[in-house]
Amino acid sequence: DLIFQSFYSYISQDKEQVGLTYESHARNASLLEVLKESRVRDKIMGYSLRGIHKDELNMLLGDFPIKREGSQGQNKTYLVALKLAQFDFLKRTGSTVPLLLLDDIFDKLDASRVEQIVKLVAGDNFGQIFITDTNREHLDRILYKVGSDYKMFRVESGAINEMEEKER
């Protein structure tokens, strides 16, 4: 939770506080007990009424559900921060550094958040990254401003071509 919050805080430049909590419907009982208790009723209904599929992840912006109260940009920032925390977890617990794919993530985000994300992932902590975006000029300006090494490719009609320095 703290890693996720630190990523969100960096991207939003400390403008918002977020939280993430897990709410289990099992409460104090074990999952096995919960499933045993609801088995007869589940058979009658034809589907499971209780279990981990009914648990909730409460995604908060301040004290409110981000899904209802947050803007599209705040929701997108939340998702990106969650994915970056997931990347960090996989990197720390695995034997190899995972690839990071940011597929058209800049849609719905203002320029300052996009720049913060690029600064964050351009550091040494993220390894190899693939970024896709439909707004070339937007991405070019930010990559130039950040000053990190990168290669750019054009994908057109199924063909992948590396762009020359002068094309960027």
Specify the residue positions occupied by each region the protein language model found.
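H-loop (His-switch) motif in ABC-type P-loop NTPases
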Residues: 132-134
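Walker B catalytic acidic pair
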Residues: 103-105
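Conserved NTPase motor "head" modules and their coupling/switch loops across ABC/AAA+ ATPases, GTPases
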Residues: 1-99, 108, 112, 116-128, ...
